[in-house]
């Protein structure tokens, strides 16, 4: 699974963006977060995710925090 860093979070709107190792930003919805509470996520945290395509661009599914 690809890894990246949470680049932007809009907690009140229920979504954010992950920047992957190549610098591409992937949209993610709060419903894609696994094993963590969306409201407790913070920008700069490292995650792994499933890369998905959508009509609006790169999207992240199955978002999980990385330990350490």
What are these regions (language model features)?
Residues 10, 22, 64-67:
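A generic structural motif
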């Amino acid at each position: 699974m690809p890894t990246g860093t949470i680049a932007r979070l809009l907690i009140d709107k229920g979504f954010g963006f992950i920047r992957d190792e190549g610098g591409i930003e992937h949209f993610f919805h709060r419903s894609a977060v696994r094993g963590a509470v969306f409201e407790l996520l913070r920008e700069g945290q490292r995650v792994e995710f499933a890369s998905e395509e959508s009509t609006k661009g790169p999207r992240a599914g199955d978002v999980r925090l990385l330990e350490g």
